Swiss-Prot record:
It comes from the Bacteria. This is Probable potassium transport system protein Kup. It comes from Anaeromyxobacter dehalogenans (strain 2CP-C). It holds the Pfam family K_trans_C. Keywords: Cell inner membrane, Cell membrane, Ion transport, Membrane, Potassium, Potassium transport, Symport, Transmembrane, Transmembrane helix, Transport. It catalyses: K(+)(in) + H(+)(in) = K(+)(out) + H(+)(out).
Amino acid sequence: MSQIPSPNDPPPAGAVPTSGAPAGPSATPAPSPTAGFSLPEHRPAPTGKALAALAVGALGVVYGDIGTSPLYSLKECFGGPHGVHPTDANVLGVLSLVFWAMTFVVTFKYMSFVMRADNRGEGGILALMALVGKTETTRLGRRVLLMLGLFGAALLYGDGIITPAISVLGAVEGVAVAAPAMERVVVPATVVILVFLFLFQKQGTAKVGAVFGPIMLVWFATIAVLGVRGILHDPSILRALLPTHALSFFARNGWHGFLVLGGVVLVITGGEALYADMGHFGKRPIRVAWLGLAMPALLLNYLGQGALLLHDPGAARNPFYLLAPEWALYPTIAIATAAAIVASQALISGAYSLTQQAIQLGYSPRVTIRHTSQREIGQIYLPEVNWMLGTACVALVLGFQTSSRLASAYGIAVTGTMIVTTLLFHRVMRDRWGWARWKAWPLTVLFLTVDASFFLANVVKFRDGGWFPIAAAALVFTLMSTWKRGRDALALMLKDAGLPLDLFMADVARRKVQRVAGTAVFMTSNPGGVPPVLLHHLKHNKVLHERVILVSILAHEIPFVAEAERVNARELGSGFFQVIAHYGFMETPDVPALLDSLPRRALAGPRLTIVPMETTYFLGRETLLANGPSTIPTWRKRLFIVMARNAQTASAFFGLPPNRVVEMGAQIQL
């Protein structure tokens, strides 16, 4: 028999009204993403030392991906399968495209606009989807937004797989520049570094995380110095800042020039991380770190590489490392490798957070979530996700062999996510901010024109490796959408077959049911109904405990719920109590700790005291069959059943003590 999620899981965020009414997939969510909760108190923007500390911290988490792009970006523009010959005019044109891509996409689009669309301070594709989903009233509209958000999230997983592989590989390739005879050790060394990186994940990053920011600070300082050194040799490269060189590049190279955008886009990979990590550092530190250090350092380095190419077109084989003086080559390789590891860690941690959000929002099966820090709630470790990412990264390195080949696979995932973000952001402008069409549409069209240009330039790389992120995204999208549909169908079936709580309580008051000592806790996703496991228990055992607690864990489309609004409790009579706990999509519930905290909370309802050794938790353990009346295609039913069978058990997910859990089985035809 398989452990399925619906009877004991929190329902998908927004699917359950907070009033305590019967809930299910068809329940209409409140029109506000706050789900009836008060907004958090305004936090003053950090200044002085606090701002500087947060900005340095942001360097280690937010800018790892985009910060390591100089390792391979220009090499791809001039030496990739669609690269152009590094003539003076082409070098100036490509560098002009690099500057304006960074300025428009990162500074203008993300810094100035997208980062304003936060979900209670949190960013990212799923947080944005949850934010705009509340304003959509039509079923078709919500479905379209859901599909967009899930596909964007699926593309981010592809990005999370490629980034560690290409960053570490690009850094280690410097060894071949310093000693060409050592080229054969590049791939094995990269694999060893990645294996150790993923093995280390279970230890957490609480201790080493403090040095991530300083490492990236040294990295940005290093690439800035290297860039200045190159510019001083040929200051004429500064002409590339004029947009006329970008325009003349397209006019001169035509379609071939357009395809070079597939390499130029590599300089803005990681732009989505600015938005996704907004909740960790805040908008101001991220902006200060970008405008004050990251962007100037990156721009100086790209211009320095360009100056080198003006002087020596043959340096296109690896302009980053050839920019360094011979005596500094090995130290640069060491710093680059450290920066690549930091960039990889940021993407791995991002995949953990994305999965946690997907679980709480109802788009992913439960997996093991371990908190690796007692002080930082966001520091988590997901073993299943870690090993899947690690295996995929190593396979990519072994399959593609070079960062140049991997670059062909990189752009599609990044640009696809950018398009999804733009489409969802348009809904924020129209529905959340109330912008008129004449104001919102020109900005959306401008963003989409740039995003689509980068995307189309990368689509032609499909056979060269672009198939990988598309295949990975399609797989993740299929899994997430199947889980969502299966959960909704199952929740609806259980709701229709259930018994309203008020009718059950009236029946209990009339009947004389034998009571036994102790406390029984029944988990239910429907606060207005009776959990099926309670009905089965009463039918077969014909007894009830002296005290029965019905616990509902409700997930909401906000990142965090204030502790003052965490729990509602009330006495139902006849020894029954109801506890409804609210969690955001960035939180993980712990039911025993929750129940233990009830006496300390100032609740309008009763003050419940739980004695752990006198408490029994009852859960349903259902066997799913694919021959039921649901309209879901049979292949999706079977896939959902497999996913449910391999999901983490409800008892483990909610932190229930194994020796105090009783499971009762039943068959359900889906």
